[in-house]
Amino acid sequence: MAGVLRSLRFWMIICVQVLSLVLAQDRDEFVYHDFSQADLHLDGMASIDDGRLHLTNNTTKSTGHAFWKIPMNFTTSPSSSLSFSTEFVFAIFPLLGDGQGMAFVVAPFMDIRYSGDAASYLGLFNRKNDNKTENHILAVELDTNSSPEAIEDSDNHVGIDINSIISEDSANASYFSGTEGKNISFRLASEKSILVWIDYNGTEKLLNVTVAPVPTPKPALPYLSSSIKPRKPLLSRFINISEIFNGTMFVGFSGSTGTVKSDQYILGWSFKKGGQAESLDLSKILDPPNRPPPPSSPPPPPPPPPTPPTSRSKDSKNIIIICVTVTSIAFLLMLGGFLYLYKKKKYAEVLEHWENEYSPQRYSFRNLYKAIRGFRENRLLGAGGFGKVYKGELPSGTQIAVKRVYHNAEQGMKQYAAEIASMGRLRHKNLVQLLGYCRRKGELLLVYDYMPNGSLDDYLFNKNKLKDLTWSQRVNIIKGVASALLYLHEEWEQVVLHRDIKASNILLDADLNGRLGDFGLARFHDRGENLQATRVVGTIGYMAPELTAMGVATTKTDIYAFGSFILEVVCGRRPVEPDRPPEQMHLLKWVATCGKRDTLMDVVDSKLGDFKAKEAKLLLKLGMLCSQSNPESRPSMRHIIQYLEGNATIPSISFDTAGFGIPNISNETITQMTATSSSANFSFEDVTILFGGR
């Protein structure tokens, strides 16, 4: 019997321990007004001193971390919420300068110590892993140092960091005063208690950060932090943390010291996942300690016995003082020169005398670098054969798209810049506006209006798109692009050949209007000018037969590509799709086949619900008319506009003359096309062809 009781007692103890462990794993909130018994994981300089969490001390180039030991479950599921809220009180004592700063951190693990230069990165990153998406770190920094590693120039700012020391958003430390109706600035490294509120709404995907000094003298009676929380947050940013967090995460703090030092204290902390954190009772929070003593140093040696001063000793002493002063000044000048050259090299641009005439359209590299947060991966909108495109925001609040391409000196950069300036003068509601450019070393940055709805290509072919375009929206986009091409071909001061018309180069603005973009292959020429044969460029399925045969781009080759574009939008498929059955592989041939069978409506995009059959038939016939193998049979853009608006009747077409193979061009046309290019020597090595979108 005694044995049975002992066995039962043993299993009861095991069950209690397991239950305690399970309950501990489910804890999603805590409050600390004192850290004496706090369940924290500490490393580096971090320690608990008299109930205060002491993150950093007077050690140089070191880090300190403190994390709550129990992980938080941030997996996305119907039963869990990604919302969280936290409050904490901190104080920073500057010892030499204001120190490097500290941060509230949500990280996938507690041990985030790095060797090397981590102290310059708030103890969160180092030079090798900064700006890596695999970091899975969200931090709110309280930065008291301006360093070359970060873009922010202020040594007293609050920032939201995602996987990098470069903040997604930042602002100088201040709080909104309801009585004065404005923001009031204060110092983070003030030796005084400062409150921080961080709230993330998982439904709205909105992160708010608010800061304010704790009132002095501190209330002796119970006094909740919520009563002094400013109405307006300092920072407010839309962030999808499900793309950052990696399931189980840890919450805590990170601090660091570089060559400048500071004591950083956390005096109270409240946290809750899935709701609002409990307000801290300020009457229970410990005051900041008295100013920490300066670093200890060995006692000075006893003074030597006094000797009567002599004129020689006085002269020697003056010489030493002068030498030390001159050496110090020289060192400071060298250091200043080094920092100046470092920043100058970092933001160095290429600027030649002939570019002065284009100066109103030049942007400084420094401003663009800040606008797109240092070419970070999370700012990347797309990439292709002509460079990468990043999203940015100018200080005025204007959103921009910046294309980063590498230019070839042999192309004649002066001519290229002149064409950029010409493109900057193009003004049409259905063109993506080029705002300006910047040259730096071997790269060129082109600045455009930002189009919030991305490319038409994405709407037509991305299966993950939540919403398809309606029939009326597609028709409106086709009409908009046609209007833009009429402007380029006939209404501007020169003839502009786009040479790369396709769905991936049509961008959609906030109202889903189509705008023709990507002028990377565009060419300008005067009206009546004989056209030169050039390197053959374009995309398979959009290139007119005479372009590949003769190497001369004209308005008719643009119209051929526009015809392929019309078919692409109406049919919801690319001009060439190798995975389809042979007779359907080439869209133009498939439409021609269905036209001859009198089953033209079979090619209309099956994703469309309701559509107007009469309009669809007109657009399909217009696409085929633009795609005739003989360029003389293709309409001009002015006639195309008339057909689209119903002001003219589209002529009857033959479905047997779709543009494939060698074109049927008259001798007169061939003579005109080759008049100035008889010396051109073409081979397949001269052809630059793209397949599909980019």
Swiss-Prot record:
Signal peptide: 1-24
Family matches, as InterPro entries: ConA-like_dom_sf, Kinase-like_dom_sf, L-type_Lectin-RKs, Lectin_legB_Mn/Ca_BS, Legume_lectin_dom, Prot_kinase_dom, Protein_kinase_ATP_BS, Ser/Thr_kinase_AS
Membrane topology reported for the UniProt record: Single-pass type I membrane protein
Amino acid composition bias (Pro residues), ranges on this chain: 289-309
Gene Ontology, cellular component aspect: plasma membrane
Keyword hit for Endoplasmic reticulum: no
Protein name: Putative L-type lectin-domain containing receptor kinase II.2
Family: In the C-terminal section; belongs to the protein kinase superfamily. Ser/Thr protein kinase family. In the N-terminal section; belongs to the leguminous lectin family.
UniProt entry keywords in alphabetical sequence: ATP-binding, Cell membrane, Glycoprotein, Kinase, Lectin, Membrane, Nucleotide-binding, Receptor, Serine/threonine-protein kinase, Signal, Transferase, Transmembrane, Transmembrane helix
Entry-linked CDD domains: lectin_legume_LecRK_Arcelin_ConA, STKc_IRAK
GO molecular function, one term: transmembrane receptor protein serine/threonine kinase activity
Region (Legume-lectin like): 27-272
Catalytic activity: L-seryl-[protein] + ATP = O-phospho-L-seryl-[protein] + ADP + H(+); L-threonyl-[protein] + ATP = O-phospho-L-threonyl-[protein] + ADP + H(+)
One Pfam family it belongs to: Lectin_legB
Positions annotated as active site in the UniProt record: 500 (proton acceptor)
BP terms from Gene Ontology: defense response to bacterium; defense response to oomycetes
Transmembrane residue ranges: 319-339
Localization per Swiss-Prot or TrEMBL: Cell membrane
Organism domain of life: Eukaryota
Binding site for ATP: 381-389, 403
PROSITE patterns in UniProt: LECTIN_LEGUME_BETA, PROTEIN_KINASE_ATP, PROTEIN_KINASE_DOM, PROTEIN_KINASE_ST
Main location class: membrane
